[in-house]
């Protein structure tokens, strides 16, 4: 009985070891934070049990679009065919072992395509994008390719190069599986439907490796060394250049009109001549990219000495202090509005905001001027001269009455003046008569 228990526990340990890479074993979660913070009680024995049931989230893999000699199944059979001394004297692995080997290599579809076919192939690029577009960028794909290539190269060095006869026999034994895989690959969606715009126009598809060549040809060795040495150099042919729209004739005319009044400082953003020559090379399909127009940043310098249309034309008069302050404020306000119009983009929203702001400033200034005029009128009325809280209606009524009384007094004084003038004329005439009589 104890032997059976120990055997069962040993089997459980082996099962756990076989699926251990799919569990989280790096980080420990705090299920009992209070106990761990107090550190008075040891952790419960059931804390680490639930971690055995946490599986790693794996992204879905797209099926291979390559068929024939470039398919991963051909790589699985041709590159990793077993030797006679590995399976205990048999000539080859069993059908289950071959299926497991093909399935394992299908997971690294991107790796198999990378060292069997040329990376400049358009189908290879689109296949990588379909597999990797919703998880990470091309740098992550290049890193994954370099890591898996290194592991497969080490495995091939340990196992040795297979003989072509055994590879051919392995290919014939697994023909049923290859037919199923090629049928699944033919049902895959064409990447050109999903990505209508080709990523590198200058790259032309190259043929795959011939069946007579070995799994690792010189081109694949050079690809492996270049991938391991410079992982950042791989995304360069896939770089998408940001294009700016070309300048039209209307834009150039507007720029010429603006140059008459403002100072334009242009900053051009140009690409290096090497990249432009590479991008300007003729493509295989005959498509050419539009020329990159320079990005121009403009900065306006508005002159402060502008013509004020509200000012008098030629004659210079001495205005009172209130009138002079009003004219100066009008000039400043006009300059501020001109600066805002030049600095802000020409859109309807900004123009409406500027008009509203200008109207508010002018209205506030008009009210202040009206208030000051009322205060000046109040100071001229004797009855309201010392009344600072007099309302505007009272000021207007008292001012009207005071004006009428002043006008009546003016008429009275004018009549008195006329009477005095007549009296003076009479006295002058009488004095003239007396002088004549005395003489």
UniProtKB/Swiss-Prot annotation:
In this chain, composition skew of type Low complexity spans 210-237
For the motif 9aaTAD, give the residue ranges.
Answer: 100-108
Q: Where is this cross-link: Glycyl lysine isopeptide (Lys-Gly) (interchain with G-Cter in SUMO2)?
A: 52, 143, 148, 298
Start and end of every bHLH domain?
A: 354-406
Q: Where is the composition biased (Polar residues)?
A: 335-347
Against InterPro entries, the record matches this protein to:
bHLH_dom, HLH_DNA-bd_sf, Myc-LZ, Myc_transcription_factors, Tscrpt_reg_Myc, Tscrpt_reg_Myc_N
Domain of life according to the entry: Eukaryota
Region feature Disordered, mapped onto this chain = 203-359
Acidic residues bias: where?
A: 251-263
Q: Which residues carry this modification: Phosphothreonine?
A: 58, 315
Instruction: Map motif UBR5-degron onto the chain.
Output: 355-364
Q: Which residues carry this modification: Phosphoserine?
A: 6, 62, 71, 81, 151, 159, 161, 293, 314, 329, 344, 347-348
In its record, the post-translational modification comment is:
Phosphorylated by PRKDC. Phosphorylation at Ser-329 by PIM2 leads to the stabilization of MYC. Phosphorylation at Ser-62 by CDK2 prevents Ras-induced senescence. Phosphorylated at Ser-62 by DYRK2; this primes the protein for subsequent phosphorylation by GSK3B at Thr-58. Phosphorylation at Thr-58 and Ser-62 by GSK3 is required for ubiquitination and degradation by the proteasome. Dephosphorylation at multiple sites by the PNUTS-PP1 complex promotes MYC stability by preventing ubiquitination by the SCF(FBXW7) complex. Ubiquitinated by the SCF(FBXW7) complex when phosphorylated at Thr-58 and Ser-62, leading to its degradation by the proteasome. Ubiquitination is counteracted by USP28 in the nucleoplasm and USP36 in the nucleolus, both interacting with of FBXW7, leading to its deubiquitination and preventing degradation. Also polyubiquitinated by the DCX(TRPC4AP) complex. Ubiquitinated by UBR5 when not forming a heterodimer with another bHLH protein, leading to its degradation: UBR5 recognizes and binds a degron that is only available upon heterodimer dissociation.
Q: Which GO terms describe its cellular component?
A: cytoplasm; nucleolus; nucleoplasm; nucleus
The record's Pfam families line, in alphabetical order, gives: HLH, Myc-LZ, Myc_N
| Chain intervals for the UniProt region annotation (Leucine-zipper) | 413-434
Gene Ontology biological process terms in this record: chromatin remodeling; chromosome organization; DNA damage response; G1/S transition of mitotic cell cycle; intracellular iron ion homeostasis; MAPK cascade; negative regulation of apoptotic process; negative regulation of cell division
Q: How does it assemble?
A: Efficient DNA binding requires dimerization with another bHLH protein. Binds DNA as a heterodimer with MAX. Interacts with TAF1C and SPAG9. Interacts with PARP10. Interacts with KDM5A and KDM5B. Interacts (when phosphorylated at Thr-58 and Ser-62) with FBXW7. Interacts with PIM2. Interacts with RIOX1. The heterodimer MYC:MAX interacts with ABI1; the interaction may enhance MYC:MAX transcriptional activity. Interacts with TRIM6. Interacts with NPM1; the binary complex is recruited to the promoter of MYC target genes and enhances their transcription.
- The name of this protein is Myc proto-oncogene protein
Q: Which organism is it from?
A: Tupaia glis (Common tree shrew)
Q: List the gene name.
A: MYC
